[in-house]
């Protein structure tokens, strides 16, 4: 079972991706994790990408395509791809790779939330720069405001978590995803799930769909 999962900033797609990995034994491939890995290593590529993100801009397609395709070469089946493709050019790169290697996609799943929900979820995040602990000023606040419970370090707000940056990222997402959604809808594999509400409630909307696809693929392989 090969899945694409996407959604606006703060939609919970990464959280649900990890749940899908646990439930169905898929390999998780995240464009965000790959990008952050480069940034944390402070490679020349990572520094270049960090500059784009700090402005709320998308990283150029050529850079993202290289990162993702390189990772897919090590995992050709049973994967969930989080946050990619995000532009028509990335769709072309992915489709060409999948076609050349005889790989089929079973589902393009969008977890959707509105702009204000996106801003509330993202702009409220606070990160500990020392130990990496993550908090939210509303949903998961530290015991002492602004201070990490784990190590006592002053919490920070990431540059790309600021409200104005989040709104820009959201609007870029909506604009760029329109043709991508149209493409995968035409292929008959696109499904939108309402991402509003608590994580367990959203998961209840996702799981029946995945169970159906999982059983369908299981039966298909039995008859091959």
UniProtKB/Swiss-Prot annotation:
Keywords, alphabetical: ATP-binding, Cytoplasm, Kinase, Metal-binding, Nucleotide biosynthesis, Nucleotide-binding, Transferase, Zinc
A GO biological process held by the record: AMP salvage
Catalytic reaction annotation: AMP + ATP = 2 ADP
Keyword Kinase applies: yes
Pfam family, one: ADK
Binding site for Zn(2+): 128, 131, 148, 151
Root EC class: transferase
Matching PROSITE patterns: ADENYLATE_KINASE
Main location (coarse class): cytoplasm
Membrane spanning residue stretches: none
MF-aspect GO terms: adenylate kinase activity; ATP binding; zinc ion binding
Pathway: Purine metabolism; AMP biosynthesis via salvage pathway; AMP from ADP: step 1/1
Binding site for ATP: 10-15, 125, 134-135, 197
CDD domains according to UniProt: ADK
InterPro entries tied to this protein: Adenyl_kin_sub, Adenylat/UMP-CMP_kin, Adenylat_kinase_CS, Adenylate_kinase_lid-dom, P-loop_NTPase
GO-annotated cellular components: cytoplasm
Region: NMP, residue numbers: 30-59
EC numbers on record: 2.7.4.3
Domain free text: Consists of three domains, a large central CORE domain and two small peripheral domains, NMPbind and LID, which undergo movements during catalysis. The LID domain closes over the site of phosphoryl transfer upon ATP binding. Assembling and dissambling the active center during each catalytic cycle provides an effective means to prevent ATP hydrolysis. Some bacteria have evolved a zinc-coordinating structure that stabilizes the LID domain.
Quaternary structure note: Monomer.
NCBIfam families per UniProt: adk, PRK00279.2-5
Protein name (record): Adenylate kinase
Species annotation: Thermococcus gammatolerans (strain DSM 15229 / JCM 11827 / EJ3)
Lineage: Archaea, Methanobacteriati, Methanobacteriota, Thermococci, Thermococcales
């Amino acid at each position: 079972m090969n899945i694409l999962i996407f959604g606006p900033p703060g939609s919970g797609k990464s959280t649900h991706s990890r749940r899908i990995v646990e439930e169905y034994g898929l390999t998780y491939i995240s464009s965000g994790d790959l990008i952050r890995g480069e940034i944390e290593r402070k490679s020349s590529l990572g520094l270049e990408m960090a500059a784009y993100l700090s402005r709320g801009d998308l990283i150029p397609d050529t850079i993202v395509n290289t990162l993702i395709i390189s990772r897919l070469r090590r995992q050709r089946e049973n994967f969930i791809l989080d946050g990619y493709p995000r532009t028509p050019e990335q769709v072309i790169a992915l489709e060409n790779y999948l076609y050349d290697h005889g790989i089929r996609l079973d589902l393009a799943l969008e977890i959707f939330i509105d702009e204000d929900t996106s801003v509330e979820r993202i702009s409220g995040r606070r990160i500990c720069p020392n130990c990496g602990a993550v908090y939210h000023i509303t949903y998961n606040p530290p015991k002492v405001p602004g201070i990490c419970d784990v190590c006592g370090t002053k919490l920070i707000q990431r540059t790309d978590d600021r409200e104005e940056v989040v709104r820009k990222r959201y609007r870029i997402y909506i604009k760029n995803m329109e043709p991508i959604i149209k493409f995968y809808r035409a292929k008959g594999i696109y499904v939108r799930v309402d991402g509003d509400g608590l994580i367990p409630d959203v998961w209840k909307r996702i799981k029946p769909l995945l169970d159906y696809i999982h059983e369908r693929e299981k039966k298909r392989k039995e008859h091959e």
